Amino acid sequence: MSRFFANGSDSESESSEEEVQATNFNKASAFQFSDDEEEVKRVVRSTKEKRYENLTNIIKTIRNHKKIKDIPNTLSSFEDLTKAYTKALPVISKEENGITPRFYIRCLAELEDFINEVWEDREGRKNLSKNNSKSLGTLRQKVRKYIKDFEDDLSRFREAPDQESEAEDEEAAQDSDGGDAGDDSDAGIKREPAEAAPKVAKTVPAKAAPADDDDSDDSIDWDSDSETETESSDDENQYQNMRERFLKRTTEKEEKDDDKRKDKRKEQKIKIRKRPEDDEDGEWETVVKGHVVEKPKMFEKDAEIDIPLVLAKLVEIMSARGKKRTDRRLQIDLLFELRDISDQHNLGTAVSVKIHFNIISAIFDYNQKISEPMKLEHWALLLEVMQSMLKLLLVNPDIHMSESVAEEHEELATSPFYVRGCPLAAVERLDDEFTKLLKECDPHSNDYVSRLKDEVNVVKTIELVLQYFENDGNNNERCRIYLRKIEHLYYKFDPEVLKKKRGEIPQNTQTSVDVMDRLCKFIYAKDDTDRIRTRAILAHIYHHAMHDNWFQARDLVLMSHLQDNIDAADPATRILYNRMMANLGLCAFRQENIKDAHHCLVDLMVTGKPKELLAQGLLPQRQHERSAEQEKIEKQRQMPFHMHINLELLECVYLVSAMLLEIPYIAAHEFDARRRMISKTFYQQLRSSERQSLVGPPESMREHVVAAAKAMRCGNWQACANFIVNKKMNTKVWDLFYESDRVREMLTKFIKEESLRTYLFTYSNVYTSISIPSLAQMYELPVQKVHSIISKMIINEELMASLDDPTETVVMHRSEPSRLQALAMQFVDKVTNLVDVNEKVFDMKQGNFFQRGNMGNRGDRGYNRNQDGNWGGQLRDIKRIRGQRIQRGRKHQQQQQQQVQTIDEE
């Protein structure tokens, strides 16, 4: 029979049956398969086999690229490897309980070694092409960043790189044979026990050895068992079309294979993950990552545990500190175990304190990069250990812990105890780590709120250190810990302070202002370093300004002379100074000191970079204005989000203060060519708005202030107040103030007063006299207030007028020129300046081209006159022009005097 028929029998009856069946099939089912194709067992592979095969293929590709140093392709293959591992994570977490396969760790270790080898070869790097060099740097950064999550696995692998676990052998076997399990029956038989071989031979025909002749099909030894023939014929009858042949078949052998693999894997996992409490002897250890790591033994079984032995073990553990291949997590675990052993054998509190301090140092050392924040589990552990150590120190006052105690002078056995260490440095580092954690979080997320809740524990730890140093510490240490306490307190608003001012609570109630006074005054008296004292003064001023103690804050600024030497301070202190000035300006604004508020804020706002000056963010810079290292340093100096000052509030207060000062000044010096600008920023905003041909309704905060300024120039206080105090501005700005209603009332009052002053400056030349009650009614002010404002203007010689008390009127003197006269005088001044400039240009063009030595010789004069023109006539013209200019000036002065006399007579 032909080999293309489904059944390989020589029987004519079977062949006729096949022909009858073939006539009933459609064209799609008419395709038949050869005997070789029937022998191939089609099996759908599991997801694990697919994922692992993909990983191994990429790893082989990476190794090939490393051999020829093809770095760009190595980079692309590494990216493919990370993506493939990400896809395989669900399988790994399900099948391996999250244990990273050893072959994957081996690949990462080899890749890291390859990169380090190429990177350290400086001569070889110089010979690399531009593409290879660029790819090497990118690959190095990506690999170093990626392997951070596999540090523990890599460290264990490097300790025993040649050790192969049973799990890796099984994975390697599955990776190499998983894809060919259905094609090679011998491979499947080899993985089975010897007893299962006969059954497999019955169900799966063995593949014969290859023969030299072409008729190898005829030499196949078929089993003559009738059951096998029946089964094979039944199998052939089952597949009536192509689709059914490719559906997965689950044989009895495969089911047994799967069951045995699962049982073996379960036994292995149970052996690895067995808990100590499940064993009677308690000798089993929990292994985190896949294979057993033997922990170093602390002491011998029959060793006598005493203080020297524990200290020797402590020195042994800490001697590995900072070394390259030190397992930092294991080091922390060993220290905790040593602490427990010390407590079990009652070796004393001093030994426990020393071990606590070394645990704190080990936790700090876990993160090698100082600029990066520590992990959250380490942070929680650090807080717990720190507070535990400080409580031990407070309960046992006979323990003296100081960095001045040398190692050989430590006393841990008898009281008084002396322990080497510095809890102050530890709590300062703890505070810095807390700030890093806050900066790392998104300020608008719940993580930031969760981290911010830890500030309670940080402040509690600082309080414990403060109590310890108040009992046992020098002035320098107390000043340092007081400053840490101040830095957590100075920016927080305490409503009890204002209630105490109003008498709503007893006067003996201690508020945050009282605490700040006590801490800062101690630093003022005892500190011998300028930095701590300066920062304490700045924080003290900030806290006073936040609680509206304007005069105390102002006096501290003036008496300390901070503004004279702040430029020599460190960047962190300068940032605190900028924050203090910003808050002082807000305080002055709330206390109705508009001019002082403007003076405090002008230096911050005129630069256009208040965000950077207050360390609340970085502005986008041009390409070469800031290097990457400078940007990194500036980011480290940024303030946490909860300490930020609202920049829009700050700018609005500055612009409103500038408006209240600038608009009356512009109206008073409208025709003064030499008038100065009070606020350059506000003046630019006003001029840019005036240059626009079409101005729409205001939308932003700046547009509202500019529109209010235009209304104030006309004396329209109601429109001005509506632009400044409205629903949109309340939401953006004014509601951010404590007691915002009082601030809005203060703003409305100032707008009325400055609008009145602007009105009098602008229209004083129109009125002969004006009624004070009419002005009071127009601006909704008390008559006494209007009288006071006008009196001040007259005294300061801003308004040329006099008050007539019987009639309650203001009589204008009209001593100032009218608008037309002022414009005419400006025109005369400009024409005079133009004439002077033209005369100077004329003199420069004429020059002196004759020799001064021959001026007395008439012949030479005649020669010069004939050759270059009449120079004598030119001199006469110059004298005549100068005489005319002097006469015009005298006439102009006489005319002005006559005008003044005429005005006085009228």
Swiss-Prot record:
Location within or outside the cell:
Cytoplasm
**Xref: PROSITE patterns:** PCI (PS50250)
* Composition skew (Basic and acidic residues), residue ranges: 242-270
Q: Which UniProt keywords apply?
A: Cytoplasm, Initiation factor, Phosphoprotein, Protein biosynthesis
Q: Could you tell me where the Low complexity compositional bias lies? A: 195-209, 894-906
Which ranges are annotated Acidic residues under compositional bias?
11-20, 162-186, 211-237
Gene Ontology CC: one annotated term: eukaryotic 43S preinitiation complex
Can you state the subunit structure given in the record? Answer: Component of the eukaryotic translation initiation factor 3 (eIF-3) complex. The eIF-3 complex interacts with pix.
Q: Which family is it part of? A: Belongs to the eIF-3 subunit C family.
HAMAP family, alphabetically? eIF3c
This chain belongs to the protein called Eukaryotic translation initiation factor 3 subunit C
Q: What lineage does the source organism belong to?
A: Eukaryota, Metazoa, Ecdysozoa, Arthropoda, Hexapoda
